[in-house]
Amino acid sequence: MTAKTLYDKLWEMHEVTRRDDGSSLIYIDRHILHEVTSPQAFEGLRLAGRNPWRIDANIATPDHNVPTTRAERQGGLESISDEVSRLQVQTLDENCDDFGILEFKMNDARQGIVHVVGPEQGATLPGMTVVCGDSHTSTHGAFGALAHGIGTSEVEHVLATQCLITKKMKNLQVRVEGTLPFGVTAKDIVLAVIGKIGTAGGNGHALEFAGSAIRALSMEGRMTICNMSIEAGARVGMVAVDEKTIAYVKGRPFAPKGADWDAAVALWSTLVSDPDAHFDTVVELHAEDIKPQVSWGTSPEMVLAIDQHVPDPATEQDPTKRNSIERALKYMGLKANQAITDIRLDRVFIGSCTNSRIEDLRAAAAVAKGRKVASTIKQALVVPGSGLVKAQAEAEGLDKVFLDAGFEWREPGCSMCLAMNPDKLGSGEHCASTSNRNFEGRQGAGGRTHLVSPAMAAAAAVSGHFVDVRELGDSGVGIRDS
């Protein structure tokens, strides 16, 4: 029998038919919806006189446009000041009500970012195909699922048929062996991977993360690395199923129960790549070589270790790369050879679908405890990824740690990850952000984004500039997974 990768197995489990043009029709187990990419899809159903093929395969929640201050949230839909944002959230409510789709509405205790809500509800399960009109759907691959983003027209197709036409990708394995040093996290792993292979390195591939350092990560840590697979060019990111996967899923609202649970676990336990499976490309990193990472430019691949210096375009022989460095330096307001630790900051954002889970908040709080946000920092935001994460953090007293340190404690949502809600950067402002993209204008017109782990973001907040979180000593305990 031919050895198979995890991706091969998941593909074969869901392939309905192969078409003459080489594409396949695959079955979709779970469809997650939010307010931005679903309105046109629902309208398409109405115009065609169709209903969703499997209503219970869909769940929805608003996240991109929702305000995150308590006052605005208490005001309901009318508190959303931007007319387009308000209309999108309202339209999602109406569409889900009309078609009978389960939605965690803006002020539901279970509301949150789609890629946080799906896993914590158990709506994401091992072996599933999971799609959403959002590129960071790769997050769900942490559960041994085949998960990726889709476009608005495809959202309509999945609603109508529960299937999708797509082509099989190649297999890419990223192996990270060894033990992560103190203060180095899952976010640092994935930033280091992107720095190594570039933002096009995974193009056309399904990316499986493997190795002892990956197996040592918590499920939250695995979600972080799978989340940013798309920044490495891979539409799909995944980690094989193990006992941590199964333990995380057990008992969650959507998880199987009783005999169904036993049968599911038996199947899930097979969702690993066979020892002799062929990968088209293999990339290897040693965990011990990875240091806390900071992005300096306008692409996630423009990333360096905390003890390094911004590149000098004069030393770059390739004219295209040299021009790219020059443009990034100009936009970011940095100088060639500037030390990363000399980059001063205006704002700090801890949140997003990459790093807003309970372990992320614990890691940031461990650094913030007993310290104060630097006087030069205009704003330091902590935005939980869901209402359930927020409630757990408050039960653990993390909100008090952040508030005492001078951070703002917010309601769940995408927040400052992207400029689609009131949380934005001003032009020229530098932000230490735990999000996933640092493109020009991503967090606001003219805003300058630096991607870091939650611990590094908290360390920057209390210092006013980037510092090596490892130099803060024992306060960084427990920061390895985030």
Swiss-Prot record:
EC number: 4.2.1.33
Cofactor needs: [4Fe-4S] cluster
Pathway assigned to this chain's UniProt record: Amino-acid biosynthesis; L-leucine biosynthesis; L-leucine from 3-methyl-2-oxobutanoate: step 2/4
InterPro entries to which the protein is assigned, alphabetical: 3-IsopropMal_deHydase_lsu, Acnase/IPM_dHydase_lsu_aba_1/3, Acoase/IPM_deHydtase_lsu_aba, Aconitase_4Fe-4S_BS, Aconitase_4Fe-4S_dom, IPM_dehydratase_rel_enz, IPMI_cat
Biological process per Gene Ontology, one example term: L-leucine biosynthetic process
Molecular function in Gene Ontology: 3-isopropylmalate dehydratase activity; 4 iron, 4 sulfur cluster binding; metal ion binding
Keyword Cell inner membrane found: no
SUPFAM superfamilies cross-referenced by the UniProt entry: Aconitase iron-sulfur domain (SSF53732)
Reactions catalysed, as given in the entry: (2R,3S)-3-isopropylmalate = (2S)-2-isopropylmalate
Keyword DNA-binding attributed: no
Keyword line: 4Fe-4S, Amino-acid biosynthesis, Branched-chain amino acid biosynthesis, Iron, Iron-sulfur, Leucine biosynthesis, Lyase, Metal-binding
Catalytic class of the enzyme: lyase
Cofactor note: Binds 1 [4Fe-4S] cluster per subunit.
Residues annotated to bind [4Fe-4S] cluster: 353, 414, 417
Residues of the signal peptide: none
PANTHER family, per database record: 3-ISOPROPYLMALATE DEHYDRATASE, HOMOACONITASE, MITOCHONDRIAL-RELATED
Entry function: Catalyzes the isomerization between 2-isopropylmalate and 3-isopropylmalate, via the formation of 2-isopropylmaleate.
Subunit (UniProt): Heterodimer of LeuC and LeuD.
Family the UniProt entry places it in: Belongs to the aconitase/IPM isomerase family. LeuC type 1 subfamily.
Protein name: 3-isopropylmalate dehydratase large subunit
Recorded name of the encoding gene: leuC
